[in-house]
């Protein structure tokens, strides 16, 4: 586990606000526990949350029975544009295999406390997504579920809904909203099949060579450069924080 993970983009969690308001939840107590009014972050593209705030958010919301499907709803809302530069870079790729490589390279810009590793085998590609930072079981499982569902949403959009069957294995046990996962076919979910907390996605070769409709090599080059600059800035910010911490000891 890596303790030096930068703060996490707030943009994903902000997507829960409309749903919570639709469910007529009073968020006053939650905002007090977080020490901030999340709704004020909506217009801040680079707003961040600490892991402690995310732990508080998840544990508070999942206390309510009506919110047991929040991971599913959050994941389902994650279209490619939710990932900003990385999402647009994926859309600009030539084919699925190239897109998976780009996703792996810049996954820390999407979810910095998780890692995506892509392994190419005979006739199949395996995506391994696992945490880089220690967190409570409740928070970890929430994120694993949301990331898995979010992948389905983004993958279907990337292929313009022309997706062939593929398999998603998770370490978490079957959730109460399992019937809702039928909406994500042809993805097939397999729960409780992994020992290590993680997700493994198996994509067959017949999905990999699919040409993407918005492929644009010029745009991809520019977007990747911007992604690299963001990674460099995050690394620099981390070094500055480490230096300040050292000086204050």
What is each stretch, according to the model?
Residues 3-12, 123-124, 130-136, 140, ...:
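Surface-exposed, interaction-prone regions with an acidic/low-complexity signature
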Residues 15, 56, 60, 98-102, ...:
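Long, highly charged amphipathic alpha-helices
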Residues 50, 84-206:
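N-terminal regulatory/effector-sensing and dimerization cores
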Residues 23, 68, 110, 158, ...:
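Solvent-exposed amphipathic alpha-helical surface segments
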Residues 181-249:
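Extended mid-to-C-terminal alpha-helical interaction segments
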Residues 1-125:
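N-terminal low-complexity or simple alpha-helical regulatory segments
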């Amino acid at each position: 586990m890596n303790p030096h993970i930068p703060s996490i983009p707030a943009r994903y969690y902000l997507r829960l606000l409309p749903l919570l308001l639709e469910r007529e939840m009073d968020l006053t107590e939650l905002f007090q526990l977080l020490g901030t009014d999340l709704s004020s972050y909506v217009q801040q593209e680079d707003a961040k949350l600490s892991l402690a705030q995310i732990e508080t958010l998840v544990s508070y919301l999942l206390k309510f029975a009506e919110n047991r499907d929040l991971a599913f709803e959050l994941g389902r809302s994650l279209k490619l544009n939710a990932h900003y530069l990385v999402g647009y870079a994926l859309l600009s790729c030539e084919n699925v295999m190239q897109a998976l490589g780009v996703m792996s390279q810049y996954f820390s810009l999407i979810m910095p406390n998780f890692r995506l590793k892509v392994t190419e085998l005979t006739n199949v590609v395996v995506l391994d997504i696992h945490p880089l930072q220690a967190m409570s079981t409740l928070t970890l499982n929430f994120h694993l579920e949301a990331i898995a569902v979010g992948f389905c949403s983004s993958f279907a959009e990337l292929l313009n809904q022309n997706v062939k069957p593929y398999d998603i294995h998770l370490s978490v046990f079957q959730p109460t909203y399992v019937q809702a996962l039928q909406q994500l076919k042809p993805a097939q979910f397999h729960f409780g099949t992994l020992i290590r907390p993680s997700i493994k996605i198996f994509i067959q070769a017949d999905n990999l060579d699919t040409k993407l409709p918005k492929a644009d090599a010029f745009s991809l080059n520019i977007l990747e450069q911007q992604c690299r600059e963001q990674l460099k800035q995050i690394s620099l910010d981390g070094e500055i924080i480490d230096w300040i911490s050292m000086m204050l000891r």
